[in-house]
Curated annotation (Swiss-Prot):
Catalytic activity: L-glutamate 5-semialdehyde + phosphate + NADP(+) = L-glutamyl 5-phosphate + NADPH + H(+)
Pathway the protein acts in: Amino-acid biosynthesis; L-proline biosynthesis; L-glutamate 5-semialdehyde from L-glutamate: step 2/2
Keywords from the named record: Amino-acid biosynthesis, Cytoplasm, NADP, Oxidoreductase, Proline biosynthesis
Enzyme Commission (EC) number: 1.2.1.41
Function comment: Catalyzes the NADPH-dependent reduction of L-glutamate 5-phosphate into L-glutamate 5-semialdehyde and phosphate. The product spontaneously undergoes cyclization to form 1-pyrroline-5-carboxylate.
Top-rank EC class of the record's enzyme: oxidoreductase
Listed GO CC annotations: cytoplasm
Name of protein: Gamma-glutamyl phosphate reductase
Gene name linked to the record: proA
Main localization of the protein described in the UniProt heading: cytoplasm
Localization per record: Cytoplasm
GO biological process: L-proline biosynthetic process
Highest taxon above the source species: Bacteria
Length: 422
């Protein structure tokens, strides 16, 4: 059998097993799913030594290949990280089970009752890079939402992912659930991804987590729905009526709390009428923290340390201590800038004016829009969703942080008592 044919056959086998397991998991009650999650957490704690050994082998290989220190840092597991993985599974067990929940049940003039029931999606493929903890997180979320999961991690983490998956499958067996409810793609050949994302007969949704190149490839090639976001070009707009103290706190936190996250501010927009009072204050703080500032001519006229911005800077997701700064004439220009250069991820306004706050909420077309709050709040835990599988900037199905409910669908249910349509 040729290599390509073998990969196709292997992926088809994974898909068939996942589809069969999904039918069983979809019927599992909450107690059984929670039993499995707690058992997974226990197995991860019990097998800490073997997890660390598998990860050490991955890290050694990564160093030999000359991978960047940032990638190796994301790849590395520690005892603390393993404990956090286990705790994450226990937190998922503590979340409310969305499956079977009925909403909007109402009588129709015909006498029937019509409502909606929350149901699993089926089989979810998660494709991710570097971070082994995603293996446990994704497995736990998919299971709690009544789905089977096919996990394809980065080749640099293959041994870590296999070791974590073994713990996950131990937990599934403990609860009497099929171990094929969570499977890891064993091959590191990239052709496996191409096969996985086109298996519409077996896979119901794909969730890519990784760099822009990976996500663009999957979005372009997939034949099944994809939950994704390409960039996190997040803005904070400081309005004319902003409270300066609030504006300083929000802008500082949105940029400097963490530089490498998708909900970090990348562009600061400031109303011209408040710029002279606000911009020198916030720029002093940011420059002292080592943030490189790139601004338009008006911003540079107010603050000496700002470098000239070019057109590409307004589109940039830096994921680094770099910030674009622009002075705008009014809220309309700010909203136009966000519509032109933003990524529909998270954008915030700092204002004390109710009507302008409402305008910003209505007109900014992003998955999260905030008033007087840091963009760093765009997170499943912060929104009360519990763990999240990612953030979606798409408009169909899930949008924003994707928690358990985002991994489900709905079906209409109709209740009658011998009713017929006249």
């Amino acid at each position: 059998m040729e290599k390509t044919e073998k990969i196709q056959a292997d992926m088809q086998a994974l898909g068939r097993a996942a589809r069969a397991a999904a039918r069983i998991v979809a019927k599992a009650d909450t107690a059984v799913k929670n039993h499995a999650l707690i058992a997974m957490a226990r197995a991860i704690r019990c097998h800490e030594a073997s997890l660390l050994a598998a990860n050490a082998a991955d890290v050694a290989q990564a160093r030999n290949k000359g991978l960047e220190p940032a990638m190796i840092d994301r790849l590395t597991l520690t005892p603390k990280g393993i404990a956090s993985m286990a705790a994450g599974l226990e937190q998922i067990a503590a979340l409310s089970d969305p499956i079977g929940a009925v909403t909007d049940l109402d009588y129709r003039p015909s006498g029937i009752q019509v409502g909606r029931m929350r149901v699993p999606l089926g089989v979810i493929a998660i494709i991710y890079e570097a971070r082994p903890n995603v293996t446990a997180d994704a497995a736990g979320l998919c299971l709690k939402a009544g789905n089977a999961a096919i996990l394809r991690g980065g080749s640099e983490a293959i041994q870590s992912n296999q070791a974590i998956a073994a713990c996950v499958q131990e937990g599934l067996r403990s609860a009497g659930l099929p171990e094929h409810a969570v499977q890891v793609v064993e091959t590191t050949d990239r052709a496996a991804v191409g096969e996985l994302i086109t298996m519409s007969e077996y896979v119901d949704m794909v969730v890519p987590r990784g760099g822009k190149g990976l996500i663009e490839r999957i979005a372009n090639e997939a034949r099944v729905p994809v939950i994704k976001h390409l960039d996190g070009v997040c803005h904070v707009y400081v309005d004319l009526s902003a409270d300066l103290e609030k504006a300083v706190r929000v802008a500082d936190n949105a940029k400097t709390q963490r530089y490498g996250t998708c909900n970090t501010m990348e562009t600061l927009l400031v109303h011209a009428g408040i710029a002279e009072r606000f911009l020198p204050r916030i720029c002093k703080i940011l420059l002292e923290k080592g943030v490189e500032l790139r601004g338009d001519e008006a911003a540079r006229a107010l603050v000496a340390g700002i470098k000239p911005a070019v057109e590409e800077d307004w589109y940039a997701e830096y994921l680094a201590p770099v910030l674009s700064v622009r002075i705008v004439e009014d809220i309309d220009q700010a909203i136009t800038h966000i519509a032109t250069y933003g990524s529909q991820h998270t954008d915030a306004i700092v204002t004390e004016d109710y009507s302008r706050a409402r305008q910003f909420l209505r007109e900014v077309d992003s998955s999260s829009v905030m008033i007087n709050a840091s963009t760093r709040f765009a997170d499943g835990f912060e929104y009360g969703l519990g763990a999240e599988i990612g953030i979606s900037t798409d408009k169909l199905h899930a949008r924003g942080p994707v928690g358990l409910e985002g991994l489900t669908s709905q079906k209409f249910i109709v209740l009658g008592d011998g009713h017929i349509r006249e």
